[in-house]
A protein has these predicted regions:
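A "functional boundary" signal
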Residues: 2-313
Length: 318
């Protein structure tokens, strides 16, 4: 776990990325309160708005709450499904069901997601919803594989034929070139071609925003890790973690891996601080993978942190 500690030298660029993340964490409560206020403002008008505005308000509520509060996201989607419009509009109904499956997947209800997706008839899935459909299947498959590899203490061999087939479907139905580049990059990663993945994704990273920027940033981190560039691995994990904090997402994807990376180079204080950051938010969404990662890392890093603190106190008293 500390294999890189003796030989690693951090670049100024990566040190700045970590500093920016530290600053973002200091302001985390402000970011979350700001988003929570926006969510509450929409909740407060739901019962008073015109009928023709209700579904749009619920959609806006979902878009704000998704990746911040799973419970609020599910409530918004259920409100949509309860409307007469959802009973008449197949696209609206199926879209809400697919987004609901996405939320359940983050929560860790992988079996529920599989059943929900099987219950949606293929003829009811429009081309627009097919992007969401394959995206949900793919993410659920990856999360389930990650969960199983943690439980069974075995590594994912990266040659998952199902995952590759799902990526092909995502690439085929994706109309946005930036999103398509993200999935092509992930495919190259799965095929063990990190340099190809970096070449595909780098031009799109600067053009991306929101969730797709997070996706590309995390994939870039994986590519750098595969290439053996520890400094760049940490850099991209720090940048995507900062984006999560600033945009008030609490289902952290990069930060658990960043904690592991920092521990591996002997950055115990930062690893501990980021672990505490995740602990504070572990029940907001909630996310099963995040809870598992925190539970996995906390005992080891907490013990090392306490040993370091005890050593510092002894040195200060001399």
């Amino acid at each position: 776990f500390c294999a890189f500690a003796q030989s690693f030298s951090m670049s100024p660029e990566t040190e700045k990325a970590l500093h920016d993340l530290d600053v973002a964490i200091e302001n985390k409560k402000e970011y979350q309160e700001r988003l929570s206020e926006r969510i509450d403002s929409i909740k407060n008008v739901l019962d008073k708005c015109r009928k023709d505005e209700y579904v749009d308000n619920c959609k806006q509520l979902f878009n704000l709450a998704f990746h911040y509060s799973g419970r609020a996201s599910l409530n918004a989607l259920q409100n949509i499904l309860n409307t007469p419009e959802a009973k008449q509009d197949t696209d609206l109904r199926v879209g809400a069901q697919l987004h609901m499956a996405s939320v359940y997947s983050v929560m860790g209800l992988y079996g529920v997601v599989i059943r929900m997706l099987r219950n949606i008839e293929e003829k009811d899935i429009s081309d627009v919803n097919k992007q969401i459909y394959y995206h949900t299947i793919y993410n659920n498959h990856v999360r389930l594989a990650t969960y199983e590899s943690n439980i069974l203490s075995r590594a994912d061999d990266g040659t998952d034929s199902v995952r590759l087939a799902l990526l092909d479907s995502l690439i085929a139905y994706q109309t946005d070139p930036v999103s398509k580049a993200a999935y092509k990059g992930e495919k190259a990663l799965l095929q063990g071609e990190p340099d190809k993945a970096i070449a595909i994704m780098t031009p799109s990273l600067g053009k991306s925003t929101g969730l797709i920027k997070l996706r590309i940033g995390y994939a870039m981190a994986q590519a750098e890790m595969q290439s053996g560039n520890v400094d760049k691995w940490i850099y991209y994990l720090a940048k995507t973690s900062e984006q999560d904090i600033v945009e008030a997402r609490t289902d952290y994807k990069s930060m658990p891996e960043l904690v592991q990376a920092l521990y591996s180079i002997g950055e115990i204080d930062r690893a501990y601080a980021y672990l505490v950051c995740m602990l504070e938010d572990a029940n907001i969404f909630p996310s099963r993978l995040l809870e598992m990662e925190v539970a996995h890392h906390f005992p080891l890093i907490n013990t090392k942190y306490e040993v370091n603190e005890a050593y510092k106190r002894r040195m200060d008293s001399m």
